[in-house]
Amino acid sequence: MVIDSLSGFELAVAPTFREDFRESLFRMVAALAELGVTVLMTSELEDRYTDLRFSPYGSAFLTDAIIVQRYIEVESRLERVMAVVKVRDSAHSKEIRQYEITDTGIAIGERMLRFEGLLGGRPVHTAQAPGQRP
Protein backbone atom coordinates (compact mmCIF):
# COMPACT_ATOMS: atom_id res chain seq x y z
CA MET A 1 0.00 0.00 0.00
CA VAL A 2 1.33 3.46 -0.85
CA ILE A 3 0.53 6.57 1.20
CA ASP A 4 1.62 9.56 -0.86
CA SER A 5 1.96 11.72 1.16
CA LEU A 6 1.55 11.60 4.92
CA SER A 7 0.35 15.22 5.06
CA GLY A 8 -2.56 14.51 2.70
CA PHE A 9 -3.35 11.33 4.58
CA GLU A 10 -3.37 13.28 7.84
CA LEU A 11 -5.97 15.68 6.46
CA ALA A 12 -8.17 12.75 5.41
CA VAL A 13 -7.80 10.72 8.61
CA ALA A 14 -7.67 13.33 11.34
CA PRO A 15 -8.87 16.69 9.98
CA THR A 16 -9.97 18.00 13.37
CA PHE A 17 -7.90 15.93 15.76
CA ARG A 18 -4.33 16.26 14.51
CA GLU A 19 -2.93 15.05 17.83
CA ASP A 20 -4.60 11.67 17.13
CA PHE A 21 -2.86 11.20 13.78
CA ARG A 22 0.37 9.63 15.02
CA GLU A 23 -1.50 7.05 17.09
CA SER A 24 -3.91 6.32 14.22
CA LEU A 25 -1.01 5.88 11.81
CA PHE A 26 0.74 3.53 14.23
CA ARG A 27 -2.37 1.37 14.66
CA MET A 28 -2.99 1.21 10.92
CA VAL A 29 0.62 0.30 10.02
CA ALA A 30 0.71 -2.36 12.76
CA ALA A 31 -2.56 -3.90 11.54
CA LEU A 32 -1.37 -3.94 7.92
CA ALA A 33 1.99 -5.45 8.91
CA GLU A 34 0.15 -8.25 10.73
CA LEU A 35 -1.65 -8.99 7.46
CA GLY A 36 1.66 -9.06 5.59
CA VAL A 37 0.99 -5.81 3.73
CA THR A 38 4.00 -3.66 2.85
CA VAL A 39 3.38 0.05 3.40
CA LEU A 40 5.34 2.69 1.48
CA MET A 41 4.95 6.21 2.90
CA THR A 42 6.27 9.45 1.47
CA SER A 43 6.70 12.62 3.46
CA GLU A 44 7.55 16.01 2.03
CA LEU A 45 9.52 18.09 4.47
CA GLU A 46 10.31 21.77 4.63
CA ASP A 47 13.98 22.19 3.88
CA ARG A 48 15.18 23.70 7.11
CA TYR A 49 18.58 22.03 6.78
CA THR A 50 19.30 22.71 10.43
CA ASP A 51 17.61 19.53 11.63
CA LEU A 52 17.47 16.20 9.88
CA ARG A 53 14.01 15.11 10.93
CA PHE A 54 12.60 12.55 8.55
CA SER A 55 8.92 13.12 9.29
CA PRO A 56 6.95 15.97 10.82
CA TYR A 57 4.92 13.30 12.62
CA GLY A 58 7.67 11.59 14.59
CA SER A 59 6.86 8.39 12.72
CA ALA A 60 10.39 7.24 11.85
CA PHE A 61 10.10 4.55 14.53
CA LEU A 62 7.38 2.89 12.41
CA THR A 63 9.64 2.41 9.43
CA ASP A 64 11.96 -0.38 8.43
CA ALA A 65 13.78 1.85 5.93
CA ILE A 66 14.27 5.57 5.34
CA ILE A 67 15.67 7.03 2.12
CA VAL A 68 16.22 10.77 2.01
CA GLN A 69 16.16 12.63 -1.29
CA ARG A 70 17.23 16.22 -1.66
CA TYR A 71 18.11 18.88 -4.19
CA ILE A 72 21.56 20.41 -3.79
CA GLU A 73 23.42 23.11 -5.66
CA VAL A 74 26.68 22.00 -7.27
CA GLU A 75 28.63 24.43 -9.42
CA SER A 76 25.52 26.59 -9.98
CA ARG A 77 23.36 23.60 -11.00
CA LEU A 78 20.59 21.86 -9.10
CA GLU A 79 21.36 18.18 -8.63
CA ARG A 80 19.39 15.41 -6.98
CA VAL A 81 21.03 13.31 -4.27
CA MET A 82 19.84 10.44 -2.13
CA ALA A 83 21.07 8.53 0.89
CA VAL A 84 19.84 5.49 2.75
CA VAL A 85 19.44 6.64 6.33
CA LYS A 86 17.96 3.55 7.92
CA VAL A 87 17.34 -0.08 7.05
CA ARG A 88 16.26 -2.05 10.08
CA ASP A 89 18.49 -5.06 10.85
CA SER A 90 20.72 -4.44 7.83
CA ALA A 91 24.18 -3.10 7.12
CA HIS A 92 23.36 -0.65 4.33
CA SER A 93 25.28 1.82 2.23
CA LYS A 94 25.84 5.14 3.95
CA GLU A 95 26.98 6.92 0.80
CA ILE A 96 25.36 10.03 -0.61
CA ARG A 97 24.83 9.51 -4.32
CA GLN A 98 23.54 11.56 -7.20
CA TYR A 99 20.53 10.21 -9.04
CA GLU A 100 18.55 11.08 -12.15
CA ILE A 101 15.02 10.30 -13.19
CA THR A 102 15.18 9.19 -16.82
CA ASP A 103 12.72 7.88 -19.40
CA THR A 104 13.66 4.35 -18.36
CA GLY A 105 13.60 4.83 -14.58
CA ILE A 106 15.88 5.99 -11.80
CA ALA A 107 19.61 6.00 -12.54
CA ILE A 108 21.79 5.94 -9.43
CA GLY A 109 24.98 7.86 -10.07
CA GLU A 110 28.33 8.53 -8.49
CA ARG A 111 29.13 9.16 -4.85
CA MET A 112 29.50 12.80 -3.89
CA LEU A 113 33.18 12.45 -3.01
CA ARG A 114 34.39 16.04 -3.03
CA PHE A 115 31.66 17.54 -0.88
CA GLU A 116 30.74 17.54 2.78
CA GLY A 117 27.63 18.94 4.48
CA LEU A 118 25.29 18.09 1.60
CA LEU A 119 22.33 16.92 3.67
CA GLY A 120 22.78 19.72 6.18
CA GLY A 121 22.32 22.39 3.54
CA ARG A 122 25.80 23.86 3.79
CA PRO A 123 27.89 21.92 1.30
CA VAL A 124 31.61 22.50 1.37
CA HIS A 125 33.79 21.58 -1.59
CA THR A 126 36.78 19.63 -0.34
CA ALA A 127 40.12 19.77 -2.13
CA GLN A 128 40.24 16.06 -2.87
CA ALA A 129 38.24 12.91 -2.56
CA PRO A 130 38.63 10.99 0.72
CA GLY A 131 41.45 8.47 0.57
CA GLN A 132 43.31 10.28 -2.22
CA ARG A 133 46.76 11.70 -1.73
CA PRO A 134 47.46 15.37 -2.45
Give residue ranges: language-model regions:
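Conserved P-loop NTPase
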Residues: 65, 69-134
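P-loop NTPase motor core
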Residues: 1-66, 74-76
